[in-house]
Amino acid sequence: MQIKQFDIWLADLNPQIGTETGKTRPVLILQTNLLNKIPHPSTIICPITNNVVTEAKILRVNIPRGVANLSENSDIIIDQIRAINNKRLIKRIGTLPENLSVLVKQNLKIIMDL
């Protein structure tokens, strides 16, 4: 299984606790390819939802339907970053285009004060 930064994968995020995003859903791979190239057992991700919230500005990045092989308008939930075990990753769906990858990086810098 070759995991790459800014790929979108289907992942099983259950069980969830509290406000964590659960269910089987697309996730965006955030982790650097330096770690992705070695046998690292976990991956840093952001969950993706089809519950689009347009007024959420820096907390979400919108992915239009059809982009990266997603069948619905979707949002990357920037403030739900987490590491998951690679066994949760089911299959690769697509790759986020560069313009959206840049926006994700900008929003991460803002919410993490980097």
Task: Locate predicted features.
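Conserved functional hotspots at enzyme active or ligand-binding sites that engage polyanionic ligands
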Residues: 1-114
